[in-house]
């Protein structure tokens, strides 16, 4: 069972927040919202579609991006081997860009594709627990 106001998909709970925060602040915020909470980790195309729908319905007219729980470690295009909640990255769906370090969902792709964004940018986000 998900906390009130959260949506369920395959045993996990999700909640989009229309609060503009940096990646680090958003991740910290998610850990405070629910037991086991983190920025969303997208591990299948089905989950990607579910999250895209959730964002589209709940975070209207965001400028462009929505944080997910993935950041690039180091200067190379070396993706972190795990999501912020510790789960490993097996599903990937991002747009190549110059090295920026944190990943967000891009509005132009219906919040389905991932794009590298500067981690200090303030964006809405989705928490998962």
Curated annotation (Swiss-Prot):
Localization per Swiss-Prot or TrEMBL: Secreted
Domain of life, per lineage: Eukaryota
GO CC annotations on file: extracellular region
GO molecular function: calcium ion binding; toxin activity
A family per Pfam: Lectin_C
Subunit annotation: Heterodimer of subunits A and B; disulfide-linked.
Main localization category: secreted
Family: Belongs to the snaclec family.
Record protein name field: Snaclec coagulation factor IX-binding protein subunit A
Domain C-type lectin: 1-129
Tissues showing expression: Expressed by the venom gland.
Cysteine disulfide links: 2-13, 30-127, 102-119
Binding sites annotated in the UniProt record for Ca(2+): 41, 43, 47, 128
Gene3D superfamilies: Mannose-Binding Protein A, subunit A
Task of the protein: Anticoagulant protein which binds to the gamma-carboxyglutamic acid-domain regions of factor IX (F9) (but not factor X) in the presence of calcium with a 1 to 1 stoichiometry.
Lineage: Eukaryota, Metazoa, Chordata, Craniata, Vertebrata
Key words, A-Z: Blood coagulation cascade inhibiting toxin, Calcium, Disulfide bond, Hemostasis impairing toxin, Metal-binding, Secreted, Toxin
């Amino acid at each position: 069972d998900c906390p009130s106001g959260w949506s369920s998909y395959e045993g996990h709970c999700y909640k989009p927040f229309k609060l503009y925060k940096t990646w680090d602040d958003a991740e910290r915020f998610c850990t405070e919202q629910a037991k086991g909470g983190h920025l969303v980790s997208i591990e299948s195309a089905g989950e990607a579609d579910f999250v895209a729908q959730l964002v589209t319905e709940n975070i209207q007219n965001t400028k462009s991006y929505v944080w997910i729980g993935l950041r690039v470690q180091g200067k190379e295009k070396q993706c972190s081997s795990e999501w912020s909640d510790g789960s490993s990255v097996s599903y990937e769906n991002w747009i190549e860009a110059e090295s920026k370090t944190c990943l967000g969902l891009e509005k132009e792709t219906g919040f389905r594709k991932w794009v590298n964004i500067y981690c200090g940018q303030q964006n809405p986000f989705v928490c998962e627990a």
